[in-house]
From Swiss-Prot:
HAMAP family: Ribosomal_eS28. One of its GO terms (biological process) is translation. NCBIfam families: PRK04007.1 (NF003080). This is Small ribosomal subunit protein eS28. It comes from Methanosarcina mazei (strain ATCC BAA-159 / DSM 3647 / Goe1 / Go1 / JCM 11833 / OCM 88). Belongs to the eukaryotic ribosomal protein eS28 family. InterPro entries: NA-bd_OB-fold, Ribosomal_eS28. It comes from the Archaea. Pfam families: Ribosomal_S28e.
Length: 73
C-alpha cells in the first residue's frame, strides 16, 4: 500500500464541483486530483458532504473508489 501522510489519508485538490446529489441535495459531487500516494495525479469523482469549493484540499481515506456519474430524470 502507498505511504499515507501523518493524518491517515491522501490529499486531493478539488478541481470542479459538478452538482448536488442525495435525497435532499445534501451532498456535492466533485472532481478532485490526487496529490500523493499510489494514484498521484489521477482525477477522480467523489461525493462529499459539507461546504466545498474549487481549490480546497480534501483528505481521502482511499483513492481507488469513484462515485457514479450524476444522471437527470
Amino acid at each position: 500500500m502507498a505511504e499515507e501522510s501523518t493524518t491517515g489519508g491522501f490529499a486531493a485538490e478539488v478541481i470542479d464541483v459538478i452538482g448536488n446529489t442525495g435525497m435532499h441535495g445534501e451532498a456535492s459531487q466533485i472532481q478532485c486530483r490526487v496529490l500523493e500516494g499510489r494514484d498521484k495525479g489521477r482525477v477522480i469523482t467523489r461525493n462529499c458532504v459539507g461546504p466545498v469549493r474549487i481549490g480546497d484540499i480534501l483528505m481521502l481515506l482511499e483513492t481507488s473508489r469513484e462515485a457514479k456519474k450524476l444522471t437527470t430524470r
